[in-house]
Amino acid sequence: MVSLSSVGITSALNQMRTDIKTSTQTSSNGYEIQWMLEYGNDPRTDARYEGPQPIGDSDNDGKNELLISGRDCTIRVMKWNENQQTYQQVRALRPPFYPFIHCSAGGMAIGDVTNDGKNEVAATWYTTVYRYIAFKYWIIGLNPYIFKNNGGSADCLIGDCDNDGKNELILSGGPGWESNSSVAEITVFRWNGLFLKKVSEWKDPDVNGYVYMAGLGDVDEDGENEIVCAYENKVIVLNWDAQNKVFVPTQIYKTYGQVSPFGVVCKDCDNDGNAEILLSYDGPRITIFKWNGTGYPMQFDITWPGGDPVIEGIDVGDADNDGANEVCAGAGVTHILQWNESTYVEEATLPTFGWMAVVCIGDCDNDGKNEINAGNVDVNIDSGELFTEWVFKYVPET
């Protein structure tokens, strides 16, 4: 175990920011702002970053926490305080060797990396894993392979990508600014009981691509998970070949005239029990692909004229707690769409703004109902916009 622990942030830091604890605005159809925090207007430190799995039980106490990241060398662990009816920062995770090393977590995730039935927190910086032990988050493992080889790691997620019943830590990224880097678009690590070991990768033989965010799920309905990633204007489904220990790629789409997709989500958005593939673009645009038995035709495609880039601000989940999943996508304002058996129709919008790098659905306040976490990575500073993180809650009319 590396003897580096989390660093507490005092209340003085929170006093330097605007923390709105209760609902002050209502968007369409019953969604209220449960909480928001305005970080400031400095893009070097205040911009918010995405993590595909930021809501979960990170300290194994039976209650969920919310992770918030950004360009400030910090992952904030937020916990709902029922008495004060607000989210409070209970811990702050720093990169290894901080303050001698300054870097930001482009992605973070909560899940069982070590396959012992307890959750850890994973972060992209140095491919680091934290475990909550004795009232602190301790670094139990890291693997600097990506950084050592002049690569970048934009995001990470935890799940079983080789279908052996055990989780891996999946890093998306690539060569970064170093075109001669050996770092792959997808790099997979596994906890071997002592440390994180690099066990597999997907390196495109034709291009040096960069994957901002990958998705994981059973998108071809064969009972096994696939990784979906997008780079260099193409979308790839990666099937693990267990016999040859390699990923087998299938290109499902070419994004002509579009910047490569930023966000990728593999979840059931039409409520038929099977995962679809959702992509978000600079556009601002999202597309949805659905397996038909032989391929992945496009099920849905929408662009919001005049909207801001969606970036990684896309997720699927039961946002209004009606038993059916919705699609949430941030294109300046955040759009909430639901399948009506023929297409996706807009149910509501949320009053967000800027380039949305964060849109995640989960139970943040531990009441058994989902909330929507949102945050922006770029704003119009000249017009007075601030980098902001929100939590929205659906409150049905009585």
Predicted features along the sequence, with ranges:
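Secretory targeting signatures
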Residues: M1-S27, V264
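A short beta-strand motif characteristic of beta-propeller blades
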Residues: I33-R44, Q88-P99, G141-K148, K197-D204, ...
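Beta-strand-rich domains and repeat architectures in extracellular enzymes and scaffolds
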Residues: Y39-R71
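Beta-propeller blade termini
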Residues: E50-S58, A105-V113, A154-C161, Y212-V219, ...
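Acidic/hydrophobic-patterned starts of short beta strands in beta-sheet-rich repeat architectures
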Residues: N60-S69, N115-T124, N163-S172, E221-C229, ...
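Short glycine/acidic-enriched loop and turn motifs that connect beta-strands
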Residues: D72-T74, Y126-Y130, G174-N180, K234-V235, ...
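WD40 beta-propeller blade core
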Residues: R76, T128-Y130, T187, I236, ...
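Blade-level signature of beta-propeller repeat domains, shared across WD40, Kelch, NHL, RCC1
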Residues: A357-T398
